[in-house]
A protein has these predicted regions:
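Repetitive, compositionally biased segments used for assembly/scaffolding
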Residues: 1-76
């Protein structure tokens, strides 16, 4: 299973930069956290349903078991 951070790096496609064990930037976009959960990447809002990613920038995250199948129209 990919971590939320790995999913976002694959979705946005930039070079990840880490600060300790937290993702700090993807390309030029700054990553923001609310507590321990991801909140924003650049201007794109990250939403959760329970403990799973639900939406990225308004695009729905579709799961097949423990793996992300699709985000919006982009397949993984």
């Amino acid at each position: 299973m990919m971590s939320d951070e790995e999913i976002l790096v694959a979705y946005f496609g930039g070079k990840p930069q880490w600060s300790g064990n937290k993702l700090y930037k993807i390309g030029d976009m700054r990553v923001e956290y609310s507590g321990t959960k991801l909140y924003k990447v650049g201007g794109a809002r990250i939403e959760y349903s329970g403990n799973k990613l639900y939406k990225i920038n308004g695009e729905r995250v579709e799961w097949s078991g423990n793996k992300v199948y699709k985000i919006g129209s982009k397949r993984f």
